[in-house]
């Protein structure tokens, strides 16, 4: 509501809370698909209205940034080149890190990925396109970013829910641009200069045969790659996924089914 201009205030909490709200929205839509509770429908409509109002015309939305801009008297919704003028919010980022996705710890791509998923599930459950339209705008913004950003900045992502998101958007809309983006995301991964085992980007994905690093980041990546394989049938991706799957279920999984958070320094052979 603050980002939408409904009320005034400051952003509170970690920068990935947008994504958590979109996951909540996806959950509400899933429940509504079963029980058709009109109160849930109204709840979703009210939430979506805020999302739509907070989203820029170019498709970008990240409430820490939007709120920071509003409080500084900057309205990037009206700027001709809003991607370059965006002011990074107060949570992370330095003075020289301006523009969308300048600091990956803002979790912007993570948030946008979950907006895509929420928009699709809401559309399936209700037949409405209000949130799906916002997701399309966000996906188009992401496509434009990856087509125009510097190579190093384009590789700058963690917790890559957008890998799954863009494939699901391709499935929902049939837009081939989204599938091309999903393939490109895998191609450029591991080419970043400061890649780490923790972020699964020290080496290209097609050279990875063991699970490594941060479990949340890893499982987002593996699920997204599986989606790309499902659409393209690329056998190399299946080889990587099969090997990683076997490594997890035989060596790095609790008896409860949980994937452990870290495995200490990853093997480098």
Q: Model-predicted segments: where are they?
A:
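Long, well-ordered core segments of solenoidal/helical folds
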Residues: 1-7, 43-60, 133-150, 181-198, ...
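Low-complexity, Ser/Thr/Pro/Gly-enriched N-terminal "stalk/linker" regions
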Residues: 1-20, 45-89
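Asp/Glu-centered strand-loop micro-motifs enriched in Gly/Pro and often flanked by an aromatic residue
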Residues: 1-37, 99-104
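Well-ordered alpha-helical scaffold segments within catalytic/enzyme domains
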Residues: 25-38, 113-128, 162-174, 220-235
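A conserved hydrophobic secondary-structure block that centers on an alpha-helix together
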Residues: 95-97, 103-158, 164-168
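Hydrophobic, small-residue-rich alpha-helical packing segments that form membrane-like cores
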Residues: 136-142, 153-204, 211-218
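Conserved small/polar residues in nucleotide/adenosyl-binding loops
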Residues: 262-269
């Amino acid at each position: 509501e603050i980002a939408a201009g409904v009320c005034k205030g400051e952003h509170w909490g970690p920068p990935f809370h947008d994504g958590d709200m979109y996951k909540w929205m996806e959950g509400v839509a899933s429940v509504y698909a079963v029980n058709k509770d009109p109160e849930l429908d109204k709840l979703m409509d009210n939430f979506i209205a805020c999302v739509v109002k907070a989203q820029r015309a170019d498709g970008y939305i990240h409430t820490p940034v939007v709120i920071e801009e509003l409080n500084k008297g900057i309205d990037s919704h009206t700027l001709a080149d809003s991607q370059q003028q965006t002011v990074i919010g107060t949570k992370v980022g330095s003075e020289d890190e301006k523009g969308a996705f300048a600091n990956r710890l803002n979790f912007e791509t993570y948030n946008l990925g979950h907006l895509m998923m929420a928009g699709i599930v809401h559309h399936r459950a209700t037949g409405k396109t209000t949130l799906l339209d916002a997701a399309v705008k966000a996906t188009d913004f992401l496509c434009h970013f990856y087509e125009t950003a510097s190579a190093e900045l384009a590789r700058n992502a963690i917790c890559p829910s957008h890998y799954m998101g863009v494939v699901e958007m391709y499935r929902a809309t049939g837009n081939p641009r989204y599938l091309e983006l999903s393939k490109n995301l895998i191609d450029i991964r591991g080419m970043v200069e400061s890649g780490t085992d923790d972020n699964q980007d020290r080496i290209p994905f097609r050279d990875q045969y063991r699970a490594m690093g941060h479990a949340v980041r890893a499982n987002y990546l593996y699920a997204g790659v599986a989606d790309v394989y499902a659409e393209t049938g690329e056998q190399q991706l299946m080889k990587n996924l099969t090997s990683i799957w076997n490594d997890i279920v035989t060596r790095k999984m609790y008896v409860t089914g949980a994937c452990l958070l870290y495995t200490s320094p990853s093997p480098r052979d």
